[in-house]
């Protein structure tokens, strides 16, 4: 057991985590050179296309160190985006140490900080590593100072390596063996194993990734899931050397996967503890805090026949992604679907894309909203995650919107632009610290403004140099109103949005204009209106198409022309009272882009 090392790799987006893991696998002979490909651990097609890590992946390697001993390294590659920070905290719960990878050209960024603090809070040994030293722009000395200055860990003798060229990889491995402590645990105690992750395999049922904290997990054992109290037999277990390899037992301190024919998707929740059926442990391992979704959106299948398969797909996906929340919802415009909660817009995009790809569904998404705390006049407090659920205006005493605390790191030269952006987003500055050439800014910005397009605009105002980390802070009273969109006098529930009163007029007008371009012309006029309660704030009209009924009259009598026009008018009138308007998918997505192209 003293030769086991469990660690995660944490870093900001694009600082080279996945490439470093490739090199570690290669130098320990986990895969032959023929099987080696770039970013071997990013196994999802989506991850490869976007070049980002979404799911944490684990690998077990054997490394023969310079002191002649062979060490077993279990490591977990983690994502860097703020939307997937939950994956990171789960991975860290299974480790004793973390490699903090910092790009020697870019230096410390917001995510580096956030992930590093998470690791330090969990009492992990943090080992700094300077990556990409082969770049001409690399300044390892400056970055090492920056790590000490901003993060506050010792970094003068940080290992310098280049994952791309393979320089210094040996030193990284030696550093891991030397600095990261061996796992603690009692092999003779009752079994306790933490479920780090699980996913659904169509042949095997639920496959779980576990970390054995105490005791030994053997093939054929009868185990019990502590939260549900159900027992299962262990059919297969093993490790990833990125390939799945079967073994007969997992010892204390090891990380591996197991299959025990759980057919029910909720059978082995992530963060749960497994123990032995005959000799159960008394206490549950401390798991991870459940994350609350920050952004909600409605997802509806385009054809209602897909509803069943959509429900199953969501179930399977939520097993693999514990931060996804969903509940059934129905809309008059879109039929039956689900209200889903996500950690951020990127997360929402990824989930939608995974549903469409892996489960072959066609979906419509409604505009994302955040959760509002609403105090009603009778003193009851409710949480509203969709504009349709907002009670009528005269029943509302106060609406409180969620405020996010945003930590930004950026070069001084972009400070002005970023402050302007934050003010425009109704932000309040709470802190500003200079670290050499970098500035650490802290703002409190309404969550609704952050999730909409804050990240994209922060990146574009700072030419990609600013980095952001945000988290929910509190609810705060604000003057929010619901803007309804009416098409021919009928409210379309899927198009409603909750906005701040100051922006309502502007957002309403913009949305109405946008809808006008997207709704196809019909044989009659279509009025598109934006309303707050009964008060109309904006209107535009999609002009009717009309046939020239006078084309066949040559000169002729005016009463003849009047008769034809009158007849056409009556026809249009009848049509208008009966006709209903098809709203195309693009129109629902228009809401997403309102307020973006300023």
From Swiss-Prot:
Signal peptide: none
GO cellular component: plasma membrane
GO molecular function list: GTP binding; GTPase activity; guanosine tetraphosphate binding; ribosome binding; translation elongation factor activity
Keywords: Cell inner membrane, Cell membrane, GTP-binding, Hydrolase, Membrane, Nucleotide-binding, Protein biosynthesis
Protein name: Elongation factor 4
Keyword DNA repair assigned: no
GO annotation terms (biological process): positive regulation of translation
Family: Belongs to the TRAFAC class translation factor GTPase superfamily. Classic translation factor GTPase family. LepA subfamily.
Role played: Required for accurate and efficient protein synthesis under certain stress conditions. May act as a fidelity factor of the translation reaction, by catalyzing a one-codon backward translocation of tRNAs on improperly translocated ribosomes. Back-translocation proceeds from a post-translocation (POST) complex to a pre-translocation (PRE) complex, thus giving elongation factor G a second chance to translocate the tRNAs correctly. Binds to ribosomes in a GTP-dependent manner.
Membrane topology reported for the UniProt record: Peripheral membrane protein
Domain tr-type G: 2-184
InterPro entries: EF-4 (IPR006297), EFG_III/V (IPR035647), EFG_V-like (IPR000640), EFTu-like_2 (IPR004161), G_TR_CS (IPR031157), LepA_C_sf (IPR038363), LepA_CTD (IPR013842), LepA_IV (IPR035654)
Assigned EC number: 3.6.5.n1
Domain of life of the source: Bacteria
Major subcellular site: membrane
Annotated localization: Cell inner membrane
Residues at which GTP binds: 14-19, 131-134
Pfam families tied to this protein: EFG_C, GTP_EFTU, GTP_EFTU_D2, LepA_C
Reaction it catalyzes: GTP + H2O = GDP + phosphate + H(+)
Enzyme class: hydrolase
